[in-house]
Each structure stands twice: as structure tokens, then as C-alpha cells.
């Protein structure tokens, strides 16, 4: 530990990132109560201005949007990262009566870290003794679902996915939604708790919800639900403090990360993870082989099953919700990568490939998979079966190594399901557009519709610095085809560690991709926000346009670069076309002209309307400001 690290006492000095706790403009946090008072599902309500009298003068109903920010954007909640978030799920877990509280940590490494006095100043001070399933019990959401039980978590996510859809319809927020094309998915008109239970029992969806992550606000991942996105954080050997990683977490969920993966490979991985989980309202995923490798000094050949098993228990007792495990990297697949342009690009995949070759033995994650399942179901940790042989360039897409591993992941999925363990499948990578659907179709076939979770895919390799765009294209496509969760890519991909701005850019890019996929699939209510923003745009309600967007700050800043005065926010034009060429203003005048002449078809006499409108502009001296 460095001299500086020794002097920092995080339990006294840690502070929340102030940018992450600011409420969004004209937004308030609301909570929708379920069948019991402690099921309180958060949503963000955006209030809108009335339509100006020029456009009919009507009130506009508030719009609800899915909210991943947890209590951080609730001004009524006092945030103290030193104490962590409030407990959400303990009462639900206690009521099921199938877990027990341990007397302390049971992993060897966890005990070592706890007994290391030098780490006291870095430690999160409010650690609870972990829970574990009672002997012979299975505490996974899949197990409950297959018993016909609707858990509080299932009810919670049904309310969250449905977003008060019936009320939105009654308020006129969904007068129009295009029919989607879902490629055989089973998307209902309304999400119910029973539908959630059925999807989890079938294996088509998962609720990542470790029994030791009780601060969690449950969410669901599956092709018949809203497309989710994941954001990555984590320190490295090159730096980053624990406080910085917690700040990355809160910043990421502010902008829409549905889950967060802690990919730390540097110092104090155990302590960093504790701070992250205790302050996270979203599921946390990890790649346990990274920490296991750190424990053997970075020498892959020295990894053992026993050490890896202890790492799984250590992380499960902290509350990690899903593990990426590269159990499909088999010895026979490694030679198939020899002629690739970019070889094996997955860190986890390369670690296991090196171990297999060094020992000339089969991957111990594969041979011990049943034992891993026993650990997973004792804590309800979900599998994210890693694609260690994913293509790292479009030249390598859809090759024998990639699809051979995918077939093995399908085999492992069925083993996990025999244990009633929740499971999703990781996917590529770098894939040109014409090969993306083949990836989705093959995954559905091999893995029997288990949720697919992809990194992009990147659709071209020629744009370093813009890979959030090259991958966002592929993400939107594969999300439409049936992918359940998209792992974000930042502009720094392949170039360096992302900063806060890069993280935000990556998340917003992927929120766009996910939402575009929801629209294309025809998810119920997906078009509500689009309709509201389009109406605000046509009525020149500038503030509502900003506030309904995914990133109000950037929208407002771009507008104000050229029209900074407050009066510009009631103007019936923007700087793109100016007052004389605003198509929407002209269209409104044409509508009025047609109405006055009692012309039924608005598109009749457009040319005459244009001439009359131009003359009116000249007479009014182009003064088009209106007070709201």
C-alpha cells in the first residue's frame, strides 16, 4: 500500500459524486406500490408545459420513464456512500425462510482481507454477515418460478416494465404506436407478474439478484422485455481509486446503465467491490477469473479449481449478482483460432486458453461446472456464460471457433437449468451487418432462447475513436433481432481507459440503440416518449424537448450555442432553418389555412398556403416570438 493510500480513511472521507445526485430538470421521482407496502418501484416523472394557445392550448400529461438511478436522484433521500444504500429486499428474503445468516465470511481470501489491519482505512465499515441457502435449499428466482411462486422481485419487475401503461393510454400518450416485428418473440400487450414468472421458469429471462445484494432494485433481462444495457467500471494496474470507481457507478446509472460490471484488475479488488455493491441499486457483474489471476501473480498456469472456487464464494458472499465464466473455451477449440486475424481477444478466454495449453487438460471451469452451479444456487448468482472466443475483428466473425464455443455454451445452459440456476449468454464482438442475424438465430437455436448479452457488435473496424458508433449500429440491429442486453462501448474502445464524458457518451449511445430496438420489436408503450417529444417539437416547446430527451444537458447546450437568450426558448424556429424556413411553423400555418377554408385534406393547396405564409412573414417583420 502506498504512503498516500495509508493516510486516506475512506470510512471518514468518501463523498458521493455531486453531479450524480442532481435531479433531472422538471422531473421527480415517484414510487409505484405493489401488493405489499415495501414493494415501491421507482420511476421518473417528467412534467410538461401546456400546449401554447397558437396550437390549441391544451394540458399535456406528464411522461413516465424507466429510472436506473436509484435513490441518488431523489432529493428526499440523504445519500452517504460511507453507509451504503438502504435495504430493499431483506424482508422479502426473510419471509421465504430458506436462507441462513452465517457467523462470518466463509471464503479463505475474504477472511484474510478482513484480518489485514493495513486495509482498515480502505474497508467499507458496515459489512453484514452474509446469507446462504439452508442445506438442501435452492434460492434462485428460477427455482421459485418453476415452483409456481411469484416472488416480490417478480412483481417488482412487472410493475417496472409496465410503466403504468394503462394510465398512459388513458391520458392519450399512446394514440399511435407502429406495429413491431419481433422475429418470433412473445411480447405481450401488458407485462404481468405471472408473465414474468413464466419467462423465468422457461429460462428466457433472468432477474440477477444475489441474496446478499439487498440494496438492489430488481430488474429483468430477456428478449420479451425492454432491451437493457450494461456499463463497465473497474480499476487497473495503471490506477483509479475506490472513490473514483463508486463515482463511475453513480454516474453510469444516472444516464441509464441497467447493470454494471466491475472489471477491476488492479489493487484492492475485494475492497473496491464491497464499496460498489453496497452503493449500487443495479445488479453488479464480475469476471471472477480476473481476481483469481491476481491471486497467483498473473501467472495463468498457476490457477487452480480450489482457488477459483474460493473466489466464487468470496464474491457471492459480497453480493455479486452475475458471474461471467468462460467455461466454453475448450482445449479442442483453441487451435481453431490460430489462423484468425486477431486471435483470442477476450481476456478471460486467453487466460483459460493458456491454462489449457500449459497443462494440456480440459478447461477446469467446464469440468467443474456442476460444482459451480451448486455455489450459484446457494446465493442466487446468475451465469453470464462468457464468449472467450468471440471475434475481435470482422474478418474473424462467425468462424468455427466462435460457433463451436456457442454450441458448448448451449450445452452448459441446459446443465445450469437442471440446477434451476439463471443463465444468460455472452456474444460478440466484431460482426458486419449482414452476419448479425445469423449470430442471433444461432444463439436462440443453441441456447434455447436463454437471454443473449452482446458487446456491440462493432460493424466495422475502421473507426478508432468512434467505436461507440460502429458498435451502436450493430447493437440496435441485434437488439431488434432478440438480444436482451447490450454491453456499452465508449469512444475510447481499443485506445485507452474511458473518463466520465466517455462513459456518458457510451451509455447514451447504447440507450438510443436499446430504445430503437424496443420500438422495432413493438414493446408495449415504447413509443410514448417519442410521441411526447415529437408533439413538443412541433409546438416549439423547447424546454419540454430538452427534458424529454435522453440527455437534456447536451440538448440544451447545443440549442444555446447559437440562441442563448431565454427568449429563444419560446421562439417558433431554431438556428438550423431560422424564422423564415422553419418547416414545422410553415406546416402549422398551412394547417390553419386548410382549416379556415374547411379543406378536409391538409395536404391540399400547399403551394398557395406557402405563398400566403411568406407574405405574412414579410408583413410581420419575421417577429415570431410568442410568450408561453
UniProtKB/Swiss-Prot annotation:
Requisite cofactors: [4Fe-4S] cluster
Extent of Polar residues compositional bias: 7-22
Family of the protein in this entry: Belongs to the ThiC family.
Catalytic activity entry: 5-amino-1-(5-phospho-beta-D-ribosyl)imidazole + S-adenosyl-L-methionine = 4-amino-2-methyl-5-(phosphooxymethyl)pyrimidine + CO + 5'-deoxyadenosine + formate + L-methionine + 3 H(+)
Region (Disordered): 1-22
Subunit relationships: Homodimer.
GO cellular component: cytosol
Keyword Metal-binding recorded: yes
Keywords assigned: 4Fe-4S, Iron, Iron-sulfur, Lyase, Metal-binding, S-adenosyl-L-methionine, Thiamine biosynthesis, Zinc
Record-linked Pfam families: ThiC-associated, ThiC_Rad_SAM
Residues at which substrate binds: 232, 261, 290, 326, 346-348, 387-390, 426, 453
Molecular function terms from GO: 4 iron, 4 sulfur cluster binding; carbon-carbon lyase activity; zinc ion binding
Record's protein name: Phosphomethylpyrimidine synthase
Transmembrane segments: none
Protein purpose: Catalyzes the synthesis of the hydroxymethylpyrimidine phosphate (HMP-P) moiety of thiamine from aminoimidazole ribotide (AIR) in a radical S-adenosyl-L-methionine (SAM)-dependent reaction.
Coiled-coil ranges per UniProt: none
Residues annotated as binding Zn(2+): 430, 494
